[in-house]
Amino acid sequence: GADISTSQPSPTAVMEIWDKALEEYEKILYMPISSGLSSSYNTAMMLAQEEKYEGRVLVVDDGQVAAPLHQMILDTLDMIEKGYEAEHIRELLEKAGDRMMIYIALQTLEFLKKGGRVTPAAAALGSVFNIKPILKLQTGKLDSFKKCHGMQKAKKTAIEAMQTEIRENFQDALNDGALHLLASSSGTDEENAAWVEEIKEVFPGVPILYD
């Protein structure tokens, strides 16, 4: 398969986007992925201090990535429609970031090995014994959560972790209809649809945003 890697956007590319947006809008809310996972936030903060961007580009560090960041963007659009000021939106987003987390069940240890998070020996053993790690991302910090034998067990464990999280920290939001679940997958269309249905069965009536 393809050798996949990531890198932050170049400062030039970021400024080109900002310049174009500022031709039409008075202010920009710029939402890079979590500062705990990428230097994109720090780079953007540095650029935003330049005179032409000062006070017009507001960089948001909501501690999120992937589907939760998508939800943050949808929430931002809703707040803009309601007439919220940009500074107030940034404040609310950064507070909300503390109330979101991601559980990630990994099919392979290969990318953790490439990123230096596990040794080649550990990755090889994980492959032999079909070990699937689960990671937890909260407030921009990525930590190991649990190791499971097989992907089905990993998915079940991730769902159980969310049940515990909701019961202990988000029961009021669930009761008020203010809870949102977010699902992502890198499988086939059929596998992705089955994954979402599996989540719906456990959390009936809870809105699910799927990426």
Protein language model annotation of sequence segments:
Residues 13-41:
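N-terminal glycine-rich phosphate/adenylate-binding segment common to multiple enzyme folds
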Residues 1-13:
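N-terminal glycine-rich anion-binding loop in soluble enzyme alpha/beta folds
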Residues 27, 36-40, 44-50, 54-58, ...:
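Mixed-charge interfacial surface used for oligomerization/domain docking
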